[in-house]
Amino acid sequence: TGTSYGIIAPLLHGVTSIVDEADFDAERWYRILAEQKVSVWYTAPTAIRMLMKAGAEIARKHAYPNLRFVASVGEPLNPEAVWWGKEVLGLPIHDNWWQTETGGIMIANTPAFDIKPGSMGRPLPGIEATIVKKDAEGKVSPVDTADTEGELALKRGWPSMLRGYLHNEERYRKCFAGEWYLTGDLARRDADGYFWFVGRADDVI
């Protein structure tokens, strides 16, 4: 997934990508954002929390007039980090959700909708997501009630859907219950259609 939208997509659009391979250094990161005129910054919650710990004073040494969008992925983004971005960078940080199996982002806080800090966001156009529960017989059914915890599921058939696991057909079959792909992630969906990560249904990361 990171290869798809982190490397291939920028190349197809003629976009310059900047990757800093050195150890974490808050001052250097901010300098790169400012001097290289970064417009879209994609990072991880752990990195954001490290910047928060380094203090806002370092960030305010520079200006970021070209920066227009900041996104985070890899683990749940705490609400405080979203508001830190707004206060220090002048932009909220957008969280999203995907898996290697999905081949791309499925759920996101996009610029078109209000951000709910702490949420993964809403399904992207063309993606149908729901919360499912298993009954005593193991039958999987979607849950209509808001804020009910269950397993996050996607309706099968999106363009980048996985086609199998190498040498493990049984595992692939177990990922599906009828028309639904079972992600293994526990989540809830609120009344506005935003999804909130709860945890893993298994021990796979």
Task: For each feature predicted by the language model, list its residue ranges.
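Conserved AMP-binding loop of ANL adenylate-forming enzymes
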Residues: 1-20, 43
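Short glycine/acidic-rich beta->alpha loop that forms part of the nucleotide-sugar donor binding site
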Residues: 3, 25-26
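Short, solvent-exposed loop/turn segments at the edges of secondary structure
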Residues: 5, 10-12, 65, 124-126, ...
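Gly/Ser/Thr-rich phosphate-binding loop
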Residues: 12-15, 30, 35-43, 52-116, ...
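A structural signal for the hydrophobic beta-strands that form the central parallel beta-sheet
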Residues: 19, 43, 72, 182-183, ...
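Alpha-helix N-cap/helix-start capping motif
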Residues: 23, 45-46, 75, 79, ...
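Adenylate-forming AMP-binding core of the ANL superfamily, especially NRPS adenylation
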Residues: 76, 115-167
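Conserved ATP-binding/catalytic segment of the ANL
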Residues: 144-147, 153-205
